[in-house]
């Protein structure tokens, strides 16, 4: 599949992989400008099921891993540094299992190698809503996304949360076939044992107030990876890379500098 991508900057390449429903432009708000100034070539792309391919369905984790590998090869990025979040982190982990020669190092934010009981129940609820065909009012959809995305500190800061309320209300998530299929791009079994064979240097970042993929699940991934490190950032929810971009960017750039 010909996925839309953006390629800018010069230097060692960094491939950014977005989470469920996130377009490549997600990274252009806080990450791409900083990383290009730091001397990196930044490549972002729309995952299958997003943007021009939102009507796609029936694809699997293996399909999306293949998409990512094909883009790396098409742009001659290998071995590439990867920065990923949520579903994107899971794709990156499975890429490192299947095609380790393509990856130089990886930053895995808000990730997991298995689902605990709570996250499995959340997944069942999301799936039930998607299959019901019910369309939530934009304001209620925004409420849920705010609670899932940010820390209490941000939610209780009138100034910080104002723009997010407006943005989430104005741009509700569309229940497209692609978005529904993204629900299946997740561990269907415990994958931690498979990650014990991945020797690629990896930094796992957990966001302390993340209720979608809480930090203890990310710490498990870091512990499974032979060359894994773990960092937990306080006062951040699932979108911590947007909530505290300076802290996150500094941690990633320092990790890259340590793994030249």
PLM segments and residue spans:
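Conserved HGGG/HGGXW glycine-rich cap/lid loop of the alpha/beta-hydrolase fold
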Residues: 1-54
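Short beta-strand/loop motif that positions the catalytic acidic residue
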Residues: 198, 204-206
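Flexible "cap/lid" loop of the alpha/beta hydrolase fold
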Residues: 97, 104-134
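Gly/Ala-rich beta-loop-alpha elbow adjacent to hydrolase catalytic centers
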Residues: 84, 88, 92
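Acidic catalytic loop of the alpha/beta-hydrolase fold
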Residues: 209-213
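Conserved alpha/beta-hydrolase catalytic His-Asp/Glu region
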Residues: 117, 138-184, 193-194
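Active-site loop/oxyanion-hole signature of alpha/beta-hydrolase fold enzymes
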Residues: 43-83
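Catalytic active-site module of serine/aspartate enzymes centered on a nucleophile-bearing elbow/loop
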Residues: 228-260
């Amino acid at each position: 599949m010909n996925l839309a991508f953006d390629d800018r900057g010069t230097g060692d390449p960094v491939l950014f992989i977005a989470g469920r429903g996130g377009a490549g432009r997600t990274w252009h708000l806080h990450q791409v400008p900083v990383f290009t100034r730091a001397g990196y070539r930044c490549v972002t792309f729309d995952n299958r099921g997003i943007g021009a391919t939102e009507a796609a369905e029936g694809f699997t984790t293996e399909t999306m891993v293949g998409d990512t590998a094909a883009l790396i090869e098409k742009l001659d990025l290998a071995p590439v540094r990867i920065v990923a979040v949520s579903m994107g982190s899971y794709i990156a982990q499975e890429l490192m299992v299947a095609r380790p020669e393509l990856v130089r190092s990886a930053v895995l934010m808000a990730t997991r190698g298995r689902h605990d009981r709570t996250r499995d129940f959340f997944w069942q609820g999301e799936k039930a809503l998607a299959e019901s065909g019910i369309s939530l009012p934009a304001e209620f959809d925004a409420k849920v996304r705010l609670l899932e995305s940010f820390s209490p500190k941000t939610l209780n800061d009138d100034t910080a949360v104002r723009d997010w309320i407006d943005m989430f209300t104005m741009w509700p998530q569309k229940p497209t076939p692609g978005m529904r299929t993204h629900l299946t791009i997740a561990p269907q079994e415990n994958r931690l044992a498979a990650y014990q064979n991945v020797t690629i240097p990896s930094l796992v970042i957990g966001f302390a107030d993340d209720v979608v993929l809480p930090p203890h699940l990310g710490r498990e991934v870091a512990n499974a990876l032979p060359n894994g490190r773990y960092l937990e950032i306080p006062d951040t929810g699932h979108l911590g890379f947007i909530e505290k971009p300076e802290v996150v960017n500094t941690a990633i750039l320092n990790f890259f500098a340590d793994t030249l």
